[in-house]
Amino acid sequence: MNQNFQKEKNLVLDYYKALDKAEGDEISKVLSSHIGKDYIWRGFHPFNEQSDAEELSKVFWQPFRHAFKNMQRRMDIFIAGKNQIDGFESVWVVSMGHLMGLFDNEWLGIQPSRKMAFLRYCEFNKVQDGKITETAMFFDIPHVMIQVGLTPFPPQTGAHLVQPGPMTHEGLLFDEQDAAEGEKTLASINFMVEDMRDWKHTNELPLVDELRRSWKEDMIWWGPAGIGATYTIERYAEQHSGPFRASFKDRISNGHLCKLAEGHFGGFFGWPNLTLTPTGGFMGMPATGKPGDMRVIDMYRREGDKLAENWIFIDLLHFWKQQGVDILERIAQNPRN
């Protein structure tokens, strides 16, 4: 049996079409005509939460579009589904990819390159009664910094690159999908989350064997700038999962606000998902003794009964600011570091 989220998908696609061609004050009008009452927008630091179309346009969209000329939305994943977190009541539409443009003007203290630049993004939109009532738009600002030659963090353990979409090139689900496939994907995501929630197998299984319970051997972890991307279970364990687990204490799971799947793709976001205290070593940073929140989006591709790819968006600027390190301030003070 197919799931039909065509109405919600088309609404979001129409919104993107209008937003992406709007300029200046037109952006506010597009936002106002598509968002509902009591709207809330959640974005990464320094934008955080916004609830007014005019303010969202002024604070985020207009400055970004002024900096990134001739912007193109290059989607790699487009799905919709019902939210497991509220008992499968609400419908959300998810878009992931890059916003590409000519980086011609300063943005957030980052000096322009006058060359192509890509902002990694993933956006969850809740659709109710013909309007978008809630948005989580997470994006990788440090990735833009690295593209223009800045070094916001110490050397990362994974690879830096403009990240591609799914290996299968089948992430744009504009049409109806078999509901059973989405259920399988959600089950695979849930199994993985529960299996590692307390890192409970650390003393029972080698990390690579624990990961094999959820992941394909040739899995790809597309991590954010500052951590980087890694390929195969063994390299993922070596270059991210192992160091990450060893670098924190007092790990608290705060849960998610939305979790859904459609076809072979799915994901979730939280605000925040995790609270952790650094013990030293993560991203080359020292221990602070301060708990910090991580706002995260995870998107997945399933293959068979296991996960094959994972795209991750972490608000590292927000996390490190809580630890006393203001990356944006550093960049503004030393724009050609």
Name the predicted role of every residue range.
Residues 1-337:
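C-terminal and inter-domain tail/linker signature
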